[in-house]
Amino acid sequence: MTEPVRVQVQTANPYPVIIGRGLLGELVDELTGTRTVAIFHQPPLAETAEAVRAALAEKGIDAHRIEIPDAEDGKDLAVAGFCWEVLGRIGLTRSDAVVSLGGGAATDLAGFVAATWMRGVRVIHVPTTLLAMVDAAVGGKTGINTEAGKNLVGSFHEPSAVLIDLATLETVPRNEIVAGMAEVVKTGFIADPVILELIEKDPEAALDPTGTVLPELIRRSVEVKAKVVAADLRESDLREILNYGHTLGHAIERRERYRWRHGAAVAVGLVFAAELGRLAGRLDDATADRHRTILELVGLPTTYDADAFGQLVEGMQTDKKNRAGVLRFVVLDGLAKPGRLEGPDPSLLVAAYSAVAREGTPGTGGAVLL
Protein backbone atom coordinates (compact mmCIF):
# COMPACT_ATOMS: atom_id res chain seq x y z
CA MET A 1 0.00 0.00 0.00
CA THR A 2 1.80 3.14 -1.25
CA GLU A 3 -0.90 5.81 -1.29
CA PRO A 4 -3.26 6.28 1.68
CA VAL A 5 -6.68 4.67 1.31
CA ARG A 6 -9.73 6.55 2.58
CA VAL A 7 -12.82 4.74 3.82
CA GLN A 8 -15.69 7.13 4.46
CA VAL A 9 -18.04 6.33 7.35
CA GLN A 10 -21.36 7.69 6.11
CA THR A 11 -23.20 8.50 9.32
CA ALA A 12 -25.10 11.72 10.07
CA ASN A 13 -21.66 13.24 10.73
CA PRO A 14 -19.45 11.55 8.11
CA TYR A 15 -15.78 11.07 8.83
CA PRO A 16 -12.82 9.45 7.07
CA VAL A 17 -10.76 6.45 8.10
CA ILE A 18 -7.38 6.99 6.46
CA ILE A 19 -5.15 3.91 6.06
CA GLY A 20 -1.52 4.38 5.07
CA ARG A 21 1.99 5.04 6.33
CA GLY A 22 3.54 8.19 7.79
CA LEU A 23 0.25 9.93 8.54
CA LEU A 24 1.51 12.58 10.97
CA GLY A 25 0.99 15.21 8.29
CA GLU A 26 -2.63 14.09 7.90
CA LEU A 27 -3.15 14.53 11.65
CA VAL A 28 -1.70 18.03 11.59
CA ASP A 29 -3.97 18.90 8.65
CA GLU A 30 -7.03 17.59 10.51
CA LEU A 31 -6.21 19.84 13.48
CA THR A 32 -5.35 23.01 11.56
CA GLY A 33 -7.12 25.97 13.16
CA THR A 34 -7.53 24.24 16.52
CA ARG A 35 -6.23 26.23 19.49
CA THR A 36 -5.70 23.52 22.12
CA VAL A 37 -5.26 19.74 21.77
CA ALA A 38 -5.00 17.04 24.44
CA ILE A 39 -3.07 13.94 23.34
CA PHE A 40 -4.06 10.84 25.32
CA HIS A 41 -1.36 8.19 25.12
CA GLN A 42 -0.25 5.02 26.87
CA PRO A 43 3.24 4.82 28.48
CA PRO A 44 5.01 2.91 25.67
CA LEU A 45 3.99 5.65 23.22
CA ALA A 46 5.48 8.61 25.08
CA GLU A 47 8.09 9.25 22.39
CA THR A 48 5.51 9.11 19.60
CA ALA A 49 3.17 11.38 21.55
CA GLU A 50 5.97 13.90 22.01
CA ALA A 51 6.63 13.88 18.26
CA VAL A 52 2.94 14.60 17.66
CA ARG A 53 2.96 17.38 20.27
CA ALA A 54 6.04 18.97 18.69
CA ALA A 55 4.57 18.81 15.18
CA LEU A 56 1.38 20.50 16.37
CA ALA A 57 3.36 23.11 18.29
CA GLU A 58 5.18 24.03 15.08
CA LYS A 59 1.77 24.94 13.65
CA GLY A 60 0.97 27.13 16.65
CA ILE A 61 -1.30 24.59 18.34
CA ASP A 62 -1.09 24.39 22.14
CA ALA A 63 -0.78 20.60 22.51
CA HIS A 64 -0.59 18.75 25.83
CA ARG A 65 0.24 15.10 26.52
CA ILE A 66 -1.90 13.13 28.98
CA GLU A 67 -0.36 9.77 29.87
CA ILE A 68 -2.91 7.12 30.83
CA PRO A 69 -2.44 3.58 32.21
CA ASP A 70 -1.92 0.81 29.69
CA ALA A 71 -4.64 -1.60 28.56
CA GLU A 72 -7.87 -1.99 30.55
CA ASP A 73 -6.33 -0.32 33.63
CA GLY A 74 -6.92 2.96 31.84
CA LYS A 75 -10.66 2.42 31.41
CA ASP A 76 -11.49 3.45 34.95
CA LEU A 77 -13.61 6.22 36.45
CA ALA A 78 -10.67 7.52 38.47
CA VAL A 79 -8.56 7.80 35.31
CA ALA A 80 -11.40 9.57 33.50
CA GLY A 81 -11.66 11.97 36.44
CA PHE A 82 -7.95 12.72 36.23
CA CYS A 83 -8.31 13.45 32.50
CA TRP A 84 -11.23 15.82 33.10
CA GLU A 85 -9.12 17.70 35.64
CA VAL A 86 -6.29 18.08 33.13
CA LEU A 87 -8.67 19.32 30.43
CA GLY A 88 -9.90 21.92 32.88
CA ARG A 89 -6.37 23.05 33.73
CA ILE A 90 -5.35 23.49 30.08
CA GLY A 91 -8.60 25.28 29.25
CA LEU A 92 -9.82 22.90 26.56
CA THR A 93 -13.04 24.24 25.03
CA ARG A 94 -15.66 23.00 22.59
CA SER A 95 -13.67 24.38 19.68
CA ASP A 96 -10.63 22.30 20.68
CA ALA A 97 -9.88 18.59 20.30
CA VAL A 98 -8.75 15.37 21.92
CA VAL A 99 -6.42 12.92 20.16
CA SER A 100 -6.13 9.28 21.22
CA LEU A 101 -2.85 7.52 20.54
CA GLY A 102 -2.75 3.84 21.47
CA GLY A 103 -4.75 0.65 21.57
CA GLY A 104 -8.45 -0.01 22.00
CA ALA A 105 -8.50 0.96 25.66
CA ALA A 106 -6.99 4.35 24.80
CA THR A 107 -9.60 5.04 22.12
CA ASP A 108 -12.41 3.94 24.45
CA LEU A 109 -11.24 6.20 27.28
CA ALA A 110 -10.32 9.21 25.15
CA GLY A 111 -13.62 8.97 23.29
CA PHE A 112 -15.54 8.77 26.57
CA VAL A 113 -13.72 11.78 28.05
CA ALA A 114 -14.27 13.74 24.83
CA ALA A 115 -17.96 12.80 24.80
CA THR A 116 -18.51 13.99 28.36
CA TRP A 117 -16.26 17.07 28.49
CA MET A 118 -18.50 20.11 27.91
CA ARG A 119 -21.08 17.60 26.60
CA GLY A 120 -18.89 16.74 23.65
CA VAL A 121 -15.67 17.89 22.02
CA ARG A 122 -13.98 16.69 18.87
CA VAL A 123 -11.86 13.51 19.02
CA ILE A 124 -9.44 12.03 16.48
CA HIS A 125 -8.26 8.46 16.93
CA VAL A 126 -4.77 7.30 15.96
CA PRO A 127 -4.92 3.56 16.75
CA THR A 128 -1.59 1.77 17.14
CA THR A 129 -2.72 -1.84 17.60
CA LEU A 130 -4.48 -4.10 15.12
CA LEU A 131 -7.48 -4.50 17.41
CA ALA A 132 -7.94 -0.76 17.72
CA MET A 133 -7.52 -0.26 13.97
CA VAL A 134 -10.19 -2.72 12.90
CA ASP A 135 -12.58 -2.34 15.82
CA ALA A 136 -12.34 0.11 18.70
CA ALA A 137 -11.36 3.26 16.80
CA VAL A 138 -14.15 3.05 14.21
CA GLY A 139 -17.81 3.49 15.07
CA GLY A 140 -18.05 5.96 17.92
CA LYS A 141 -18.46 3.58 20.84
CA THR A 142 -16.76 4.85 23.99
CA GLY A 143 -16.74 3.56 27.54
CA ILE A 144 -15.12 2.62 30.80
CA ASN A 145 -15.36 -0.48 32.96
CA THR A 146 -16.97 -0.90 36.38
CA GLU A 147 -17.25 -3.75 38.85
CA ALA A 148 -20.59 -4.55 37.23
CA GLY A 149 -19.02 -5.26 33.86
CA LYS A 150 -17.10 -4.13 30.78
CA ASN A 151 -18.05 -0.93 28.94
CA LEU A 152 -21.30 -0.51 30.88
CA VAL A 153 -20.68 3.22 31.34
CA GLY A 154 -20.17 5.00 28.06
CA SER A 155 -21.55 6.99 25.18
CA PHE A 156 -21.76 7.03 21.40
CA HIS A 157 -19.39 9.77 20.24
CA GLU A 158 -18.09 9.61 16.69
CA PRO A 159 -14.55 10.71 15.90
CA SER A 160 -13.94 13.43 13.35
CA ALA A 161 -11.28 11.21 11.76
CA VAL A 162 -9.43 7.93 12.27
CA LEU A 163 -5.82 7.69 11.10
CA ILE A 164 -4.47 4.15 10.73
CA ASP A 165 -0.70 4.34 10.34
CA LEU A 166 0.39 0.86 9.28
CA ALA A 167 4.00 1.58 10.24
CA THR A 168 3.06 1.46 13.92
CA LEU A 169 2.32 -2.27 13.62
CA GLU A 170 6.00 -2.86 12.86
CA THR A 171 6.87 -1.70 16.37
CA VAL A 172 4.38 -3.74 18.40
CA PRO A 173 4.96 -7.30 19.70
CA ARG A 174 3.66 -10.12 17.53
CA ASN A 175 1.17 -11.15 20.22
CA GLU A 176 -0.56 -7.77 19.82
CA ILE A 177 -1.17 -8.56 16.15
CA VAL A 178 -2.30 -12.08 17.02
CA ALA A 179 -4.78 -10.73 19.57
CA GLY A 180 -6.20 -8.22 17.10
CA MET A 181 -6.68 -10.93 14.51
CA ALA A 182 -9.71 -12.20 16.47
CA GLU A 183 -11.72 -9.17 15.36
CA VAL A 184 -10.53 -9.62 11.78
CA VAL A 185 -11.62 -13.28 11.79
CA LYS A 186 -14.95 -12.28 13.33
CA THR A 187 -15.51 -9.82 10.49
CA GLY A 188 -14.78 -12.51 7.95
CA PHE A 189 -17.40 -14.83 9.40
CA ILE A 190 -20.16 -12.23 9.72
CA ALA A 191 -19.67 -10.34 6.45
CA ASP A 192 -16.59 -10.90 4.27
CA PRO A 193 -15.48 -14.49 3.54
CA VAL A 194 -12.52 -13.22 1.47
CA ILE A 195 -10.91 -12.29 4.79
CA LEU A 196 -11.03 -15.94 5.84
CA GLU A 197 -9.64 -17.12 2.51
CA LEU A 198 -6.68 -14.74 2.77
CA ILE A 199 -5.83 -16.00 6.26
CA GLU A 200 -6.19 -19.66 5.30
CA LYS A 201 -4.02 -19.20 2.22
CA ASP A 202 -1.06 -17.81 4.18
CA PRO A 203 -1.45 -17.32 7.96
CA GLU A 204 2.07 -15.93 8.32
CA ALA A 205 1.46 -13.30 5.66
CA ALA A 206 -1.73 -12.32 7.48
CA LEU A 207 0.37 -11.52 10.56
CA ASP A 208 3.20 -9.72 8.74
CA PRO A 209 3.01 -5.92 9.21
CA THR A 210 5.53 -5.33 6.41
CA GLY A 211 3.62 -7.27 3.75
CA THR A 212 0.54 -6.64 1.62
CA VAL A 213 -1.96 -9.12 3.09
CA LEU A 214 -2.39 -7.54 6.52
CA PRO A 215 -3.16 -4.07 5.09
CA GLU A 216 -5.84 -5.67 2.89
CA LEU A 217 -7.33 -7.44 5.90
CA ILE A 218 -7.42 -4.14 7.77
CA ARG A 219 -9.05 -2.34 4.86
CA ARG A 220 -11.69 -5.02 4.41
CA SER A 221 -12.45 -5.08 8.13
CA VAL A 222 -12.80 -1.30 8.27
CA GLU A 223 -15.07 -1.28 5.22
CA VAL A 224 -17.41 -3.81 6.84
CA LYS A 225 -17.57 -1.89 10.08
CA ALA A 226 -18.11 1.40 8.26
CA LYS A 227 -21.13 -0.03 6.43
CA VAL A 228 -22.65 -1.51 9.58
CA VAL A 229 -22.11 1.63 11.64
CA ALA A 230 -23.53 3.84 8.89
CA ALA A 231 -26.72 1.77 8.95
CA ASP A 232 -27.03 1.53 12.75
CA LEU A 233 -24.85 3.90 14.75
CA ARG A 234 -26.47 3.30 18.15
CA GLU A 235 -26.64 -0.48 18.04
CA SER A 236 -30.42 -0.67 17.94
CA ASP A 237 -30.44 -3.59 15.53
CA LEU A 238 -27.89 -4.41 12.79
CA ARG A 239 -24.79 -3.25 14.69
CA GLU A 240 -25.26 -6.06 17.20
CA ILE A 241 -23.73 -8.43 14.64
CA LEU A 242 -20.35 -6.85 15.42
CA ASN A 243 -20.66 -8.45 18.85
CA TYR A 244 -20.40 -11.96 17.42
CA GLY A 245 -18.34 -13.93 19.94
CA HIS A 246 -18.35 -11.09 22.45
CA THR A 247 -21.04 -12.31 24.84
CA LEU A 248 -18.88 -15.08 26.25
CA GLY A 249 -15.73 -13.11 25.43
CA HIS A 250 -16.62 -10.21 27.72
CA ALA A 251 -17.58 -12.63 30.49
CA ILE A 252 -14.14 -14.27 30.22
CA GLU A 253 -12.43 -10.88 30.36
CA ARG A 254 -14.36 -9.94 33.49
CA ARG A 255 -13.62 -13.28 35.18
CA GLU A 256 -9.92 -12.85 34.39
CA ARG A 257 -10.03 -9.26 35.69
CA TYR A 258 -8.87 -8.17 32.25
CA ARG A 259 -5.58 -10.07 32.41
CA TRP A 260 -6.60 -11.75 29.16
CA ARG A 261 -6.34 -9.71 26.01
CA HIS A 262 -9.68 -8.83 24.47
CA GLY A 263 -8.85 -10.72 21.29
CA ALA A 264 -7.99 -13.91 23.16
CA ALA A 265 -11.31 -13.85 24.99
CA VAL A 266 -13.25 -13.09 21.80
CA ALA A 267 -11.54 -16.00 20.03
CA VAL A 268 -12.90 -18.43 22.61
CA GLY A 269 -16.25 -16.67 22.37
CA LEU A 270 -16.32 -17.19 18.60
CA VAL A 271 -15.85 -20.94 18.95
CA PHE A 272 -18.61 -21.00 21.58
CA ALA A 273 -20.98 -18.96 19.40
CA ALA A 274 -20.30 -21.19 16.41
CA GLU A 275 -21.10 -24.28 18.47
CA LEU A 276 -24.24 -22.61 19.80
CA GLY A 277 -25.38 -21.97 16.23
CA ARG A 278 -24.59 -25.55 15.24
CA LEU A 279 -26.48 -27.07 18.17
CA ALA A 280 -29.45 -24.79 17.53
CA GLY A 281 -29.65 -26.26 14.03
CA ARG A 282 -28.75 -23.00 12.33
CA LEU A 283 -25.10 -23.43 11.31
CA ASP A 284 -23.58 -26.20 9.21
CA ASP A 285 -20.80 -28.37 10.63
CA ALA A 286 -18.14 -27.24 8.17
CA THR A 287 -18.53 -23.53 8.95
CA ALA A 288 -18.68 -24.19 12.68
CA ASP A 289 -15.48 -26.25 12.57
CA ARG A 290 -13.79 -23.63 10.40
CA HIS A 291 -13.88 -21.18 13.32
CA ARG A 292 -11.51 -23.23 15.44
CA THR A 293 -9.25 -24.04 12.50
CA ILE A 294 -8.71 -20.43 11.41
CA LEU A 295 -8.30 -19.07 14.92
CA GLU A 296 -5.66 -21.67 15.69
CA LEU A 297 -3.89 -20.93 12.39
CA VAL A 298 -3.11 -17.42 13.67
CA GLY A 299 -2.23 -18.57 17.19
CA LEU A 300 -5.38 -17.65 19.09
CA PRO A 301 -6.81 -19.72 21.96
CA THR A 302 -9.94 -21.80 21.40
CA THR A 303 -10.42 -23.32 24.86
CA TYR A 304 -11.09 -22.11 28.38
CA ASP A 305 -11.42 -23.41 31.93
CA ALA A 306 -14.03 -26.18 32.16
CA ASP A 307 -14.89 -25.22 35.75
CA ALA A 308 -15.69 -21.61 34.88
CA PHE A 309 -19.07 -22.16 33.20
CA GLY A 310 -21.24 -21.06 36.13
CA GLN A 311 -19.32 -17.83 36.61
CA LEU A 312 -19.38 -17.11 32.89
CA VAL A 313 -23.16 -17.54 32.68
CA GLU A 314 -23.46 -15.07 35.54
CA GLY A 315 -21.15 -12.69 33.69
CA MET A 316 -23.17 -12.99 30.48
CA GLN A 317 -26.26 -11.78 32.35
CA THR A 318 -24.86 -8.22 32.22
CA ASP A 319 -24.37 -8.24 28.44
CA LYS A 320 -25.79 -5.12 26.80
CA LYS A 321 -27.63 -7.14 24.14
CA ASN A 322 -29.87 -8.78 26.74
CA ARG A 323 -33.49 -7.69 27.03
CA ALA A 324 -35.70 -8.18 30.10
CA GLY A 325 -33.20 -10.57 31.63
CA VAL A 326 -33.14 -12.81 28.54
CA LEU A 327 -29.75 -13.81 27.13
CA ARG A 328 -29.35 -12.86 23.47
CA PHE A 329 -26.54 -14.18 21.27
CA VAL A 330 -25.35 -13.36 17.78
CA VAL A 331 -25.10 -16.63 15.84
CA LEU A 332 -24.66 -17.54 12.19
CA ASP A 333 -27.27 -19.01 9.87
CA GLY A 334 -24.46 -19.68 7.42
CA LEU A 335 -21.25 -18.00 6.32
CA ALA A 336 -21.73 -14.21 6.34
CA LYS A 337 -25.34 -14.67 7.49
CA PRO A 338 -25.52 -13.38 11.08
CA GLY A 339 -28.69 -13.67 13.14
CA ARG A 340 -29.83 -13.76 16.75
CA LEU A 341 -30.60 -16.49 19.22
CA GLU A 342 -32.76 -15.37 22.13
CA GLY A 343 -33.25 -17.19 25.41
CA PRO A 344 -31.55 -20.48 24.53
CA ASP A 345 -32.29 -23.40 26.81
CA PRO A 346 -29.66 -23.71 29.55
CA SER A 347 -28.87 -27.23 28.35
CA LEU A 348 -27.89 -25.76 24.97
CA LEU A 349 -25.43 -23.41 26.67
CA VAL A 350 -23.91 -26.30 28.60
CA ALA A 351 -23.50 -28.35 25.44
CA ALA A 352 -21.99 -25.44 23.51
CA TYR A 353 -19.53 -24.71 26.30
CA SER A 354 -18.29 -28.28 26.15
CA ALA A 355 -16.73 -27.34 22.79
CA VAL A 356 -14.38 -24.89 24.50
CA ALA A 357 -14.11 -26.46 27.96
CA ARG A 358 -10.66 -27.55 28.97
CA GLU A 359 -9.60 -29.11 32.25
CA GLY A 360 -6.93 -27.19 34.15
CA THR A 361 -5.17 -24.08 32.86
CA PRO A 362 -6.70 -22.76 29.62
CA GLY A 363 -4.51 -22.67 26.55
CA THR A 364 -2.99 -19.36 25.55
CA GLY A 365 -2.69 -20.01 21.83
CA GLY A 366 0.77 -18.45 21.68
CA ALA A 367 1.24 -15.96 24.50
CA VAL A 368 -1.91 -13.92 24.09
CA LEU A 369 -2.32 -13.35 27.82
CA LEU A 370 -1.13 -10.10 29.31
From Swiss-Prot:
Q: Please name the GO terms that the record assigns under molecular function.
A: 3-dehydroquinate synthase activity; metal ion binding; nucleotide binding
Q: What class of enzyme is it?
A: lyase
Residues annotated to bind NAD(+): 70-75, 104-108, 128-129, 141, 150, 168-171
Q: Where does Zn(2+) bind?
A: 183, 246, 262
Q: Which NCBIfam families match?
A: aroB
Q: What does this protein do?
A: Catalyzes the conversion of 3-deoxy-D-arabino-heptulosonate 7-phosphate (DAHP) to dehydroquinate (DHQ).
Protein name (Swiss-Prot/TrEMBL): 3-dehydroquinate synthase
The organism encoding this protein is Rhodococcus opacus (strain B4)
